Amino acid sequence: MTDQSRQPRDKNYNLIAVLYHSSDNVESLKTYINDAEQEGDQELVDFFSAVLENNLTAAQRAKEMLVSRLQNEQE
C-alpha cells in the first residue's frame, strides 16, 4: 500500500473522525461512570470523569476547527 492510497479523500476527514470518536466516547464514558458509581468505586468514577472531560474538550475543539475550516472554504 502506498502512502497516497492511505490519504483520505476529504482534507477534513481526520478531523471529522476525531469529532465523531470523541463524541461517541462521551456517551460510553457516561455509562462507565454510572456503572462505577453503582459499584461504589470512586477511583473509577474519578478516572472516567477525567477521561470524559478530555473527550468533551477534544470534541469541542474539533467542532470549532471544523466550522472555521468550512467557513474559510466558502470564502
What residue spans do the PLM features occupy?
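Iron-associated oxidoreductase/ferritin-like identity signal
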Residues: 1-75
